[in-house]
């Protein structure tokens, strides 16, 4: 134990040897070869990115003209349309509110298009979101909402939401029931070594540090995010030691991705240019928002409005071409990317390490030193360096970005937009409805209060004259006080049911009209599901109970009436674009679930010892698993025993 402790400390404090990994092979970067996916991870599981020779004349950074999508994303969505339309038609035919519609004219290339956004919130979000996706999955038993996952075109995730979507993406989009029992594992916590842990045996700390040192030794700057990413990946990837060489771009090889069988996955993060604000990891609401797919790192914001292949992240570019003909692969490690989207846990990682064993306390002191030296964000070699005029075409990349060597990327929810809905508002994606699953810990006892939607609303309505984004409109939403006082955060709520009553004004509905938002908050249907943000150990039985709570909350205890009303929300924009009236049945649904504009801004006392908002468990039983309060009690007792 003591030998291991000193060895681990020595590893952390050792000076990294910086070098360059050379490869004699010529790695073609032509646009044709972008379509050739990177290989699956090999058994040589090194975390170090690989430097290869490549053609320095190839353009690898492309501007994104307004009205267009990145080329391979567009190809994916074109392929996705037929799969999604077939699933959506089946869903709508089964609901009494939409079965009588002429679905052949409503469902098609012109819509409806669906998006899913899973909020941040650590394990709380991953497990509630997992239950929600299970509820939307046609492969799940006893769900009234089955088929909506198969109908969706996009899925976004930030923080814990990115853990969820990445876990699905790298594991062939297996069912939540399967993946939660075979891969998700939290009982030992994230930085603990009491038992055998995913092939680490008793060398957990040593392995994590060795892996990060491999990256440093290859000549790349490392940060707290590298350690955090290596730790969290062990809990959702399903590969030995969390897949040290598993890349996000390798998802292109997955059969589900090649056939576009499930939604296009986007990890959402934010960029800070010009360094961190003094004493803060936050950002202004007009900072750049980046999204990472298996194909591209993209930003639609006007100060970037460009995209570059995910496969070659880490490459040093100058004006869109690789410097000295050297390209980097394997920088886009899945753990590193989702760690980037959840960097707020970097600070918690330090705190946990300082509170644990003597060995982990030493880890904490070392990581805290990294924080003091400015390594609390994630370092991405800037692909937009000097990218002012690529191939004779002027770019939109701003001077403060082209002049910096690194993109400082960090948590996708730091500006308050904890529901990663922004990428789904881009007019180019033509989405009609967004399911927004909110597991934010807004209140003192970690329940959502709508603040995430309010932050997006303010980003749009308080748009400065020099705003860096094109999204100009959003649905109207009330204050967090109204969310709580009217119970909008305790039940599903539809926002923007009338497409002519958004921030865009009373104008005809078209694809520039913001999508209707179906707000689905984390609520205690079968158990108290308000896990604290920095809880790291969860019993396997509690994982299943939390997933079941998300399932029941999403289906409203398998309510057929709610499922029929959700069908109304899905087709609403398509009907409005055609000037078709809403049916009487759907009007009744909207009167029940749509926010009608009522406000109640009475201050909400958020005393953590006696909070005003402290919802009770709604039901003692649920369809499918028949979870009950007694089970929750035993799960809690078991968790306390494990964590004692």
From Swiss-Prot:
GO terms under cellular component: cytosol; endoplasmic reticulum; external side of plasma membrane; extracellular region; fungal-type cell wall
Subcellular location: Secreted
Keyword Transferase: no
Gene3D superfamilies with a match to the protein in the record: Cytosolic phospholipase A2 catalytic domain
Source organism, top-level taxon: Eukaryota
Enzyme superclass (EC): hydrolase
Keyword Hydrolase set for record: yes
Record GO terms (molecular function): lysophospholipase activity; phospholipase A2 activity
Glycosylated residues in this chain: 44, 96, 141, 178, 221, 245, 253, 281, 286, 316, 319, 373, 393, 449, 501, 558, 579, 596
GO biological process terms on file: glycerophospholipid catabolic process
Reaction equations catalysed: a 1-acyl-sn-glycero-3-phosphocholine + H2O = sn-glycerol 3-phosphocholine + a fatty acid + H(+)
Pfam families on file: PLA2_B
E.C. numbers: 3.1.1.5
Leader sequence residues: 1-19
Domain PLA2c: from-to ranges: 53-600
Transmembrane intervals: none
Keywords: Glycoprotein, Hydrolase, Lipid degradation, Lipid metabolism, Secreted, Signal
Matching CDD domains: cPLA2_Fungal_PLB
SUPFAM superfamilies per UniProt: FabD/lysophospholipase-like (SSF52151)
InterPro entries on file: Acyl_Trfase/lysoPLipase (IPR016035), LysoPLipase_cat_dom (IPR002642)
Family classification: Belongs to the lysophospholipase family.
PANTHER family (UniProt xref): CYTOSOLIC PHOSPHOLIPASE A2, LYSOPHOSPHOLIPASE C1786.02-RELATED
Role of this protein: Catalyzes the release of fatty acids from lysophospholipids.
Protein name listed in UniProt: Probable lysophospholipase 2
Source organism (scientific name): Schizosaccharomyces pombe (strain 972 / ATCC 24843) (Fission yeast)
Lineage of origin: Eukaryota, Fungi, Dikarya, Ascomycota, Taphrinomycotina
């Amino acid at each position: 134990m003591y030998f291991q402790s000193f060895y681990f400390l020595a590893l952390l404090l050792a000076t990294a040897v910086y070098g360059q990994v050379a490869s004699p092979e010529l790695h073609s970067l032509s646009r044709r070869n972008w379509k050739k996916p990177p290989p699956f991870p090999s058994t040589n599981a090194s975390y170090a990115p690989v430097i290869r020779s490549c053609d320095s004349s190839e353009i690898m950074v492309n501007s994104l003209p307004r009205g267009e999508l990145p080329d391979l994303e567009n190809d994916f969505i074109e392929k996705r349309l037929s799969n999604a339309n077939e699933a959506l038609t089946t869903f709508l035919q089964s609901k009494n509110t939409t079965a009588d519609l002429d679905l052949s004219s409503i469902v098609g290339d012109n819509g409806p298009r669906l998006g899913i956004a899973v909020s941040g919130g650590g394990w709380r979000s991953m497990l509630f979101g997992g239950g929600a996706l299970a509820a939307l999955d046609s492969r799940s038993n006893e769900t009234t909402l089955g088929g909506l996952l198969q109908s969706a075109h996009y899925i976004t995730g930030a923080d814990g939401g990115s853990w969820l979507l990445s876990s699905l993406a790298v594991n062939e989009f297996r069912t939540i029931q399967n993946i939660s029992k075979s891969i998700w594992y939290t009982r030992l916590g994230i930085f603990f070594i009491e038992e055998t842990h995913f092939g680490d045996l008793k060398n957990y700390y040593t392995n994590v540090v060795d892996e990060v040192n491999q990256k440093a030794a290859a000549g790349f700057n490392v940060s707290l995010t590298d350690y955090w990413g290596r730790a969290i990946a062990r809990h959702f990837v399903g590969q030995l030691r969390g897949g040290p060489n598993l890349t996000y771009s390798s998802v292109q090889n997955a059969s589900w991705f090649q056939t576009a069988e499930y939604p296009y996955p986007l990890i959402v993060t934010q960029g800070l240019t010009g360094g961190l604000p003094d004493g803060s990891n936050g950002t202004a609401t007009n900072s750049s928002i980046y999204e990472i797919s298996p194909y591209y790192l993209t930003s639609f914001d006007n100060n970037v409005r460009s995209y570059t292949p995910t496969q070659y992240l880490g490459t040093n570019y100058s004006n869109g071409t690789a410097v000295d003909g050297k390209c980097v692969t394997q920088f886009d490690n899945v753990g590193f990317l989702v760690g980037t989207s959840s960097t707020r846990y970097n600070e918690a990682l330090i705190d946990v390490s300082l509170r644990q064993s003597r060995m982990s306390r030493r880890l904490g002191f070392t990581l805290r030193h990294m924080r003091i030296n400015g390594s609390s964000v994630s370092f991405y070699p800037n692909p937009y360096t000097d990218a002012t005029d690529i191939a004779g075409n002027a770019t939109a990349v701003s001077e403060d970005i082209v002049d910096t060597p690194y993109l400082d990327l960090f948590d996708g929810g730091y500006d308050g937009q904890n529901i990663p809905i922004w990428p789904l508002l881009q007019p180019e994606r033509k989405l009609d409805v967004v399911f927004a699953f909110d597991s934010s810990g807004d209140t003192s006892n970690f329940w959502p209060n709508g603040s995430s939607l309010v932050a997006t609303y303010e980003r749009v309505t308080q748009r400065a004259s020099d705003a860096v984004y094109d999204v100009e409109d959003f649905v109207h939403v009330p204050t967090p006080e109204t969310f709580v006082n009217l119970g909008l955060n305790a039940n599903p709520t539809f926002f923007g049911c009338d497409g002519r009553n958004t921030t865009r004004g009373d104008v005809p509905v078209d694809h520039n009209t913001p999508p209707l938002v179906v707000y689905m908050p984390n609520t205690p249907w079968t158990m108290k599901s308000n896990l604290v943000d920095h809880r790291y150990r969860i019993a396997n039985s509690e994982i299943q109970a939390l997933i079941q709570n998300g399932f029941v909350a999403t289906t409203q205890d398998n309510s057929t009436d709610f499922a029929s009303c959700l069908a109304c929300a899905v087709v609403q924009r398509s009907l409005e674009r055609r000037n078709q009236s809403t049916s009487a049945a759907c009007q009744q649904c909207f009167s029940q679930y749509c926010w009608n504009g009522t406000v109640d801004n009475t201050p909400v006392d958020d005393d953590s010892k006696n909070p005003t908002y402290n919802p009770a468990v709604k039901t003692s039983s649920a369809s499918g698993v028949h979870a009950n309060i007694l089970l929750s009690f035993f799960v809690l007792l078991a968790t306390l025993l494990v964590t004692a």
